[in-house]
Swiss-Prot record:
Belongs to the PINc/VapC protein family. Its EC number is 3.1.-.-. It is found in: Secreted. This is Ribonuclease VapC39. It comes from Mycobacterium tuberculosis (strain ATCC 25618 / H37Rv).
């Protein structure tokens, strides 16, 4: 099953000084050969956070972050998933999962993972409740 890497996993992989770099690297070494994916949202998030001095102790320019992302996505097993899931689709139960403003993007990424037959891999422990459906793996 292809793993859609959440922005926090991409950041941890791309930045050796990140607190979760070792955990992300271990996961990537063990499971990336099964396939891993990015989307426009996760790629833009990587560039945005990597180039934001108020978030990253050591930040870079957007151009360098894009080059880093290009190097990562050239690694074996990568697939780019177009974002072709409208936010308004789904049942009332799916919409109820968007419990607050912090869950909007999370729920959309989970919907993308479902659309492409994959799962979302994240460090966000708040998404553990979604893990029972097999759509989320919390590292």
């Amino acid at each position: 099953m292809t793993a859609l890497l959440d922005v926090n996993v991409l950041i941890a992989l791309g930045w050796p000084n990140h607190v979760h770099h070792a955990a992300a690297q271990r996961w990537f070494t063990q499971f990336s050969s099964n396939g891993w994916a990015t989307t426009p949202i996760t790629e833009a998030g990587y560039v945005r956070i990597s180039s934001n001095r108020s978030v990253m102790q050591v930040s870079t320019t957007p151009a360098i972050a894009i080059a880093q992302l290009a190097a990562m996505t050239s690694l074996a097993g990568h697939t780019f998933w177009p974002d072709d899931v409208p936010l308004i689709v789904g049942s009332a139960g799916d919409r109820d999962a968007v419990s607050n403003h912090r869950r909007v993007t999370d729920c959309h990424l989970i919907a993308l993972a479902a659309r492409y037959g994959g799962r979302l891999v994240t460090f966000d422990a708040a998404l553990a409740d979604s893990a029972s459906a097999g759509l989320v793996e919390v590292l």
